[in-house]
Amino acid sequence: MSLSSSVTKHLISASILAIVAMQLPSVHSVLSLNETNAYLHHICINGEGTFKSGSPYEKEIKQLIDFLSSFIKDYSFVHGVSGIGPDDINVKFQCRGDTLQAKCRSCLATAFSEIRSKCPNNKGRIIWYDNCHLDLSSIYTYGQIDYKNNFYMYNAKDVRGDKKSFYKNMKAFLHKLKAKASSKENKPYVKDYMYAAGRESLGTVKLYAMVQCTQDLSLKNCTVCLDWIMTKLPECCNGKQGGRVLSPSCNFRYELYPFVEN
């Protein structure tokens, strides 16, 4: 396995998040807590080609995953590259900002095991869990926003009372968290870099929300990515008590119950 010099640099600048991708919007009902680490979705990317089971390419992937796993004790975002040309292996893995180290490492093991089962021979494949997401690709995408692959989930319960007022206040709170996550005061190389979560009182109810970007993005691109997925709020979650939109580059979630660790 060969690792580029930039890979080591990226590993030392590791951090945290939870994302994974899908090519067409998908609607699900969700009522999940952080403790469950529920499987959310996966995608097998056919356009990047395939490899044979038992091939050197497959062995190289496992070696790279094992190598990156050892860094999770210090970081919750890891990125690695192995190979040259069409046989490139690019791995990005990130845990959600509130996920503890042990859960983060466990999530990587679970994600890698499941994606091998769901997309056994695809070079490009992504899987999302509540606590993490794993992105395997033959294309180098470090620092780039993925606009192609995204999906949404929503809480089956409808908002009671004034839905327009709720939507307006919820959207404003998400943008407030976006500003915090992408602020220059947000220090790189810490667990919750490019992550923000909080609680807001809306009359008699409390709104809980979080936003996060993958830590390979610049602060500017984090803002761009979150602005982009928030445009999907009307189709995702209008009138719902909770919802989320996820892409491989950023995501947000809101609920009327706590779902992140303090």
UniProtKB/Swiss-Prot annotation:
Source organism phylogeny: Eukaryota, Viridiplantae, Streptophyta, Embryophyta, Tracheophyta
Positions of the Gnk2-homologous domain: 39-141, 147-259
Keyword tags: Repeat, Secreted, Signal
Top-level taxonomic group: Eukaryota
Recorded GO CC terms: extracellular region
Pfam families reported for this sequence: Stress-antifung
Main location, first listed in the record: secreted
Gene3D superfamilies recorded: Gnk2 domain, C-X8-C-X2-C motif
Keyword Lipid metabolism: no
Annotated localization: Secreted
Family indicated by similarity: Belongs to the cysteine-rich repeat secretory protein family.
Record-linked CDD domains: Gnk2-like
Signal peptide: 1-29
Species assigned in the record: Arabidopsis thaliana (Mouse-ear cress)
Entry protein name: Putative cysteine-rich repeat secretory protein 24
Keyword Membrane applies: no
InterPro entries xrefs: CRR_secretory_protein, GNK2, GNK2_sf
